[in-house]
Amino acid sequence: MEEALAEFLRHLALEKNASAHTVKSYREDLVQALDFFRGHLQGRALEPALLTTRLLRSYMAWLHEQGYAKTTIGRRVSAVRSWCRFLCRQGTLAANPADGLRGPHQAKKLPHFLGEEDVARLLAAPPAETPLGVRDRAVLETLYSAGLRVSELTGLDLERVDLDSGLATVRGKGKRERLALLGPQALEALKRWLAVREGLAQGRGRAQAAVFLNKNGSRLTSRSVGRLVEKYLAQVGLDPRTSPHTLRHSFATHLLDNGADIRSVQELLGHRSLSTTQIYTHVTTHRLQESYEKAHPRA
């Protein structure tokens, strides 16, 4: 079964254009499932014919017994379903044992976001006197102005940014490309960063194609972006639950709050499905309800 798993992971990477992070998550989830299947079979060799609905349900029950969160169980069940569908298409399985297998019901969590004033405080936090402070301001402004995922920001190359038009070409999930819009303040922050970036890159002798570099002249990583956001959150006293992705949530919520069309927001976020974007309409509706309940005399 290891070869069948390896083939599925290759399929995800090469044919589905899944990111390395996605492939790694599938691998970890399915390796755990295979370990459970082997233990449950008590030493018998794991063959495709032994992948039964009963075995898969036993795996789900075990996940519940181990105390995993509903989101984790849902993700792992989804990984098994996807693998079984692939095995059926390949002819390895005659019937899909995962048909009808459903993860636990999960109440949709509303995305956490910052108010416009809090975003302004966070974006103003980096010092303007140091190259890294200038970089950090450009990072935060770009994340919020364009609604980028962190991986899209760290993967951004100089040749993909047009400062004259205020456009950047970013590569999102599934390696799909889209145009991201950069507002005036983000453009100004980027120009200030690019003016000092070259000196930092040359000083380290490791000039990069990346827009954003670390202090060693290498491409900035997602982990580094997380750390710098955490640092400035602490400085201005904002909710510690905030992450770089919160700026993307804030971008979408503020657009809708100010009258943007949901289809336009979908395109700007790079969502393949409108249903993914619609979670932000729930956020704005929730805020309206809260305001109504606080202000209306008969609420």
What label would you give each PLM region?
Residues 1-299:
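Conserved catalytic core of the tyrosine transesterase superfamily
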